[in-house]
UniProtKB/Swiss-Prot annotation:
Its EC number is 3.1.-.-. Its main location: cytoplasm. Residues 29-74 form the SpoVT-AbrB domain. It comes from Escherichia coli O6:K15:H31 (strain 536 / UPEC). This is Endoribonuclease SymE. The gene is symE. One of its GO terms (cellular component) is cytoplasm. Involved in the degradation and recycling of damaged RNA. It is itself a target for degradation by the ATP-dependent protease Lon. Keywords: Cytoplasm, DNA-binding, Endonuclease, Hydrolase, Nuclease, RNA-binding. Signal peptide: none annotated. GO terms for molecular function: DNA binding; RNA binding; RNA endonuclease activity. NCBIfam families: PRK13605.1 (NF010128). It comes from the Bacteria. GO terms for biological process: RNA metabolic process.
């Protein structure tokens, strides 16, 4: 039992009742035997408002009686330099040497013969 002088600290719920959604597990049929498999479909403008825009990668954690969906942050865009480096790596050895020589000239280094 709690102490008579204990006071419960008020807190704000992480999920307000206005943000709750009610769903029903339906089914999808699987070809070729058309067996029914459980399915949950989520759709609506509220998904984007919650951080789940079209194309967002989603991490799914499954526990007994609980599924947690977490939007993954977008991958950092690769710099132009790194994209160019990847293209150079696909070139022949001779062309790669030419690119290295060009970089040396641009950087101001003199080629020692």
């Amino acid at each position: 039992m709690t102490d008579t002088h204990s006071i419960a600290q008020p807190f704000e719920a992480e999920v307000s009742p206005a943000n709750n959604r009610q769903l029903t597990v339906s089914y999808a049929s699987r070809y070729p035997d058309y067996s029914r498999i459980p399915a949950i479909t989520l759709k609506g403008q509220w998904l984007e408002a919650a951080g789940f825009a079209t194309g967002t990668a989603v991490d799914v954690k499954v526990m007994e009686g609980c599924i947690v969906l977490t939007a993954q942050p977008p991958a950092a865009a690769e710099s132009e330099l790194m994209q160019s480096l990847r293209q150079v790596c696909k070139l022949s050895a001779r062309k790669q040497r030419q690119v290295q020589e060009f970089i040396g000239v641009i950087a101001g280094k003199q080629k020692v013969a």
